[in-house]
Amino acid sequence: MKTIGILGGMSWESSSVYYQLLNREVQKRLGGVHSARLLMYSFDFAEMAALQQAGQWDAANALMARVAATLAGAGADVLLIA
């Protein structure tokens, strides 16, 4: 099974939904008490929103890229933004 890295916190509500859907799908496919292999980083969206509102898109992108690299370094095989 691949390990999924989630860049969460774009809204914590959507991150929660992704977490639930991924785990339900793994359980449906594999049965029993299986669950997804996940690594999640949850942004404080206020920080990201402040960068966006200030037009600092490069800084926002750099922040997301650093977190993505951290998740990859921790073993994530794939990444998604939630």
Where do the model's predicted regions map?
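N-terminal glycine-rich anion-binding loop in soluble enzyme alpha/beta folds
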Residues: 1-63
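N-terminal glycine-rich phosphate/adenylate-binding segment common to multiple enzyme folds
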Residues: 59-82
